[in-house]
């Protein structure tokens, strides 16, 4: 997507946005103000492998998959689309990982850095 606005309304559930300085995010490139990641690109993992940590607020079982609503603190809530049924309970630790190739990077104005560098 060209910008955060477009990224936010394409897809269901919508893309997650996390400020790069947020305590739950273990690392991010220096020139990025916010990352975007789609719920289907987040994977529940062990704490040792986690790139992101949160607490489960709610889980919605939908047959082939479950939607996990995760509190990262600081008024940031994200959604993860987990395969299969889940036995996770409210309040459970939610260490998550993702493929960095699936991240979308946005500058402070919400413009995709992939787009801004592609047009220079």
Tell me the role of every PLM-derived stretch.
Residues 1-11:
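Conserved beta-strand-loop-alpha-helix hinge in the C-terminal portion
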Residues 13-16, 23-120:
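Non-catalytic connector elements of ABC transporters
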């Amino acid at each position: 997507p060209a910008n955060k606005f477009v990224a936010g309304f394409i897809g269901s559930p919508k893309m997650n946005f996390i400020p790069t300085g947020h305590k739950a995010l273990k690392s991010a490139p220096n020139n990025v103000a916010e990352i975007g990641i789609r719920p289907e690109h987040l994977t529940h993992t062990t704490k040792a492998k986690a790139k992101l940590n949160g607490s489960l607020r709610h889980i919605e079982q939908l047959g082939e998959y479950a939607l996990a609503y995760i509190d990262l603190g600081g008024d940031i809530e994200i959604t993860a689309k987990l395969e299969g049924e889940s036995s996770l309970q409210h309040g459970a630790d939610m260490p998550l990982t993702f493929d960095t190739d699936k991240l979308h990077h946005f500058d402070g104005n919400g413009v995709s850095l992939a787009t801004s560098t592609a047009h220079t």
